[in-house]
Amino acid sequence: MSQIDIPFVAIHNKGLEIKNVTKSYNKKKILDNVSLNLNRGESVALLGPNGAGKTTLFYIIMGLIKRDVGSILLDKNEISELPMYRRSKMGLGYLPQESSIFRGMNVEDNIYSILEVTESNKFKRKKIRVW
């Protein structure tokens, strides 16, 4: 383990790949052919209006709901059918923006609070742009 307790597997593997994920509810497409590549150790924030599919995508990645089409790969291993607890053991985690957790913080403050965990150098954190 490293100084911040990152599992060996998390340090020495590729990352998360979302390939062509589609999800519909009652014939309405919520996600349409979404693809995304994330490296291990990256902090990611999805920003968008209500109903854009952000939470749906995170729930699919974590295994809380099933996608209609597409693949979720972790370190090149297909995990789309794995239960949530197995994905968690493989190093996946999800921290939703809930008012009960981040009272009084705006979106930018929420993102910077996560960066404090992943980037210890205050000056490097400030150089990261939040859009």
Give the location of each predicted region.
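The feature captures the beta-strand-to-loop junction immediately N-terminal to the Walker
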Residues: 47-49
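Helix-to-loop junction immediately C-terminal to a conserved catalytic motif
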Residues: 62
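ATP-binding/catalytic-site motifs of ATP-hydrolyzing domains
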Residues: 71-73, 77-78
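ABC ATPase NBD coupling module
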Residues: 78-98, 122-125
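Short coil-to-helix segment of the ABC ATPase nucleotide-binding domain corresponding to the Q-loop/switch region
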Residues: 104-112
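Short coil-to-helix "N-cap" segments within the ABC nucleotide-binding domain's helical subdomain
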Residues: 109, 117-131
